[in-house]
Amino acid sequence: MATAGGILDQLNKASSAEDFFALLEVDYDPQVVNVVRLHILRRMGQYLVSENFEGQADDAIRARCKEVLEQAYADFLASSPLQERVFKVLKEAAQPPKPKPMVSLTVLK
């Protein structure tokens, strides 16, 4: 069962991506994390949002969080932030510009 001071509390108090990797004992390349740290943590959050940890043992929660962080990290080893588009600004950059409304000149007569 999750307890105060458990892994979720520790992750909530973590102040850097490196803290997440250390707490969950996930190996990483510092050069990769320096470039895409926010993207990795955002993706991890996207994966975890559908998880329900209520009533689970802290070891099980830690193992699942580790799997999710490893997957989020792997996502950005295999592709770029522009391809993954985890942030709104990058999602919107992929959309073509909306056409400007046109008024027919014959309507103006």
Curated annotation (Swiss-Prot):
The keyword Endoplasmic reticulum does not apply. The keyword Phosphoprotein does not apply. Keywords: Nitrogen fixation. It comes from the Bacteria. Coiled coil: none annotated. One of its GO terms (biological process) is nitrogen fixation. Belongs to the NifW family. May protect the nitrogenase Fe-Mo protein from oxidative damage. Homotrimer; associates with NifD. This is Nitrogenase-stabilizing/protective protein NifW. The lineage of its organism: Bacteria, Pseudomonadati, Pseudomonadota, Alphaproteobacteria, Hyphomicrobiales.
